[in-house]
Structure formats: C-alpha cells, structure tokens
C-alpha cells in the first residue's frame, strides 16, 4: 500500500519544492535590488545628517576659535586668469583673478566613520565664517570677491577660491611710452581683524599664471607677492602686496605712430631739396606741421595728463615740430634770398661772396660758382681798341662803348641776381645736410637707448620662461 501510494505523490512534492525555491529567488533578487537602490539614498541621508549636526548651532558671524587669544591663520594666494585692460588715462588696471584662501574652522570637524565615510562637503560661502580679506586699492567700489561654495574637509580645513574682477589703482609712468614698463600693485588684507585675530600667511610668492589668457597689448614680466605689516598705536595689521611688472607690446604704436612721425620728420628734410623759387616749400612744411599737431592730439587722448614727465613720443613730436618750424623760417629766408636783386638790396658784402660763392660750395660738394662779374670786368678793363685819328671812327667807337657799357650794366644786374640765387641754393643744400643730420641723430638719440633697455628686459624674461 505504501509503495503504490508513493508513486503519484513524488512528482507533486518535487514541483512544490521548485515553486518555493523560485519564489525565494525572486524575493532575494528583489531584496538585493532594493538594497542597491537604498545605498545612494543612505549616503545622502548621511550628508543631510552631517550638515544638520554641523550647522545646528553654527553662527557664521563668530570667529571659529576655541580660545579668545587664538588666531586664525589664513593661507593666501593669488591666481590671475586675465589682464583685461590697463587704462592709462584714468590710471586703472583691470584684472580677473582667483583668491585662494585656506584656514581651519574648529567648529566644522567630524568623524567620517559616523557619517558613511564622508570626508569632504561643499557648502555656500554665505553659510560659514569667511575672512573679510579685501583689495585695499580698489577703484570701482567692489572690494570683495564673488560668493562661491567652500570646500570643507573632515579635519576642519576650509578652502575657498572665489573669482573676482578688480579695477585697481595703478600709477602710470609714461616716460618711455610706448616702450614703457609699469609696476602695478594689489594690496590685500583683512578689513576689520587685526593680526592677533587673523594672520595672513603668503602661500606662494609667485602669482599662479597657469590659466592666464594673454593680453594683446601688455605682457606680464613678473608677478610676485610679499607680506607686510601695518602698525598703529594698539594693533598690527598684516597684508599681502602683489606687484605686477607689465610691459607694453609696442608693435601697434610703432607701426601707426612712431614710423609716421619719423617719416614726417624726414619729409621735412626734403623741403630743402625743392628748387629755391618754389612757393610750395612753405605749403609742404605747413602740411607737415598740421599732421604733427594731429598726432599730438591723438597721444593726448591716450596718455594721462601729467606735468611731471613728458612721454618719449611726445618729446619726439615736440622735437619734430620745432624742427619743422625752423625749416619754415629757413625756407622763408632762402626764398627771400632767391628773389634779391641790385635794385632792391645793397651790394653783396665781400665776406658773403667769399663764404657762399667760393668756400661753402666746395664743402657741400656743389659745382663751383664762377664769378663772371669780376672776370668780365677785368677783361673789359684790360681790353683797349686801336685809336683812330679819324673822327668817324671816334664817333663809331663812342657809340660802341656806350652800347658796351649798357650791356655790361645789364650783365652786372643779371649776375647779381644769379649770385643771390646761387646763395639761396647754397643755403638750401647746407640746411638739407644739417637737418638730415639733426633728424637722424635726434631720432637715434631718443629711441635707441629706450629700445636697448626694453630689449634687455625682454630677452632675459623669455629665456627664463623657456628654461622653466
């Protein structure tokens, strides 16, 4: 009986066991999936719990120290991302920087094991105590950086790197414009805390330029920081000063300002190469003078108005304007000499004839002027016609002598005019070489020393950057 009854029951029992096992497997898979989904939510709960515990009794206006005499040490650094502009007229430097600050907040410490292994959290800077470090020499009224999140570690280390756009005051020295170097400083310090409460530690003497975006007009030669202290009757106040030595890239001003000015100065020299009787010489000089005046107005719009120093390009323009003014005066004098005659002026002095008709032409490589007046006069005085006893011949000779004297008088007048014209040519040639020499020496004397100094600063900086 037991054997017959056990046959049909065995398949049923096996089917029941498989069904129960399948249900248990589904339940286990569902439980595993539920545990996988609940793991991230548990981390978020841990972080929520951590933030509630940290900021439950936290007051961000209170300096986070355990004892009253403890001071907070702020590790301070600066990273520059862009030199936006240098306004010479208003003497401002605009920069985009990052203020790197790090300190210990004793009220923001926790044990990572109690909060699911969380070691770092990020909270808005408005929720924690932050040092009131500002830029002292700000020029636009914005003394602090942007409110961004702080990074807090479990040991209480708070790192805050807010970006900031600053317009800082910068005394512009335009002596060597456009080959100038400027030294602009940015001074940071606490606005209310003294050194016994908040001390600033310079993290790195060099400004971080790894993310710097090049400027098309200025190049940063060096950017270094130094720490200082300001003391008064009761307290001392630490501060950090960053000095930016920036160098102007002069290519634009060289092409569109200096080279045209040099061209105008040499164009003035060519005035003396025109014929002495040309009235257009005055027009050319006047046109050059007007052009230089326009250049002066352009420079006046760029550089700051200061009576302490005169910029290099301003000195050159003033030099060229004096140069052109003298050329106008000399040209007027030469034209006056050119149009002189015996009927309008007295006879030429012997020393004038000797210097301008004999000596200077040889020195100026001009063809020697033949003194036809004296030559023809000597030939006339040395020549004598035969004496005729006949009255008709005497009468004819008297007529010839009269005609000869008249012709000689006209020749004398013509030769005096030609002598004055030749003196005008000598003056033009003399001033041509004189003004050319002065123009070359003046241009080289003004620009070469400055360019040499500028190159000596530029080359070592690039060599040092290449070695790095």
Swiss-Prot record:
Name a GO molecular-function annotation. Answer: acetylcholine-gated monoatomic cation-selective channel activity
Q: What does this protein do?
A: Component of neuronal acetylcholine receptors (nAChRs) that function as pentameric, ligand-gated cation channels with high calcium permeability among other activities. nAChRs are excitatory neurotrasnmitter receptors formed by a collection of nAChR subunits known to mediate synaptic transmission in the nervous system and the neuromuscular junction. Each nAchR subunit confers differential attributes to channel properties, including activation, deactivation and desensitization kinetics, pH sensitivity, cation permeability, and binding to allosteric modulators.
The cross-references to NCBIfam families, in alphabetical order and at most eight, read:
LIC
Record family assignment: Belongs to the ligand-gated ion channel (TC 1.A.9) family. Acetylcholine receptor (TC 1.A.9.1) subfamily. Alpha-5/CHRNA5 sub-subfamily.
Describe its membrane topology.
Answer: Multi-pass membrane protein
Recorded hits in Pfam families, A to Z, give: Neur_chan_LBD (PF02931), Neur_chan_memb (PF02932)
This chain is glycosylated at 155, 183, 229
Species this protein is from: Pan troglodytes
Name its GO BP terms in alphabetical order. acetylcholine receptor signaling pathway; membrane depolarization; monoatomic ion transmembrane transport; neuromuscular synaptic transmission; response to nicotine; synaptic transmission, cholinergic
Naming one, the record's GO cellular component terms include: postsynaptic membrane
What lineage does UniProt assign to this protein's organism?
Eukaryota, Metazoa, Chordata, Craniata, Vertebrata
Name the chemical reaction catalysed here. Ca(2+)(in) = Ca(2+)(out); K(+)(in) = K(+)(out); Na(+)(in) = Na(+)(out)
The way its activity is modulated is described as: Activated by a myriad of ligands such as acetylcholine, cytisine, nicotine, choline and epibatidine.
Q: Can you list the disulfide-bonded cysteine pairs?
A: 170-184, 234-235
Coarsely, its chief localization is membrane
Assembly notes: Neuronal AChR that forms heteropentamers composed of two different type of subunits: alpha and non-alpha (beta). CHRNA5/alpha-5 subunit is only able to form functional nAChRs when co-assembled with another alpha subunit, can be combined to CHRNA4/alpha-4 or CHRNA3/alpha-3 and CHRNB4/beta-4 or CHRNB2/beta-2 to give rise to functional receptors. Interacts with LYPD6.
Q: Give compartment(s).
A: Synaptic cell membrane; Cell membrane
Mapped to this chain, the residue ranges on the Extracellular side of the membrane are 23-254, 452-468
Instruction: State the PROSITE patterns in the record.
Output: NEUROTR_ION_CHANNEL
Q: Which residues lie on this side of the membrane: Cytoplasmic?
A: 338-429
Q: Specify the signal sequence span.
A: 1-22
Alphabetized InterPro entries for the sequence: Neur_chan_lig-bd, Neur_chan_lig-bd_sf, Neur_channel, Neuro-gated_channel_TM_sf, Neuro_actylchol_rec, Neurotrans-gated_channel_TM, Neurotransmitter_ion_chnl_CS, Nicotinic_acetylcholine_rcpt
Recorded protein name is Neuronal acetylcholine receptor subunit alpha-5
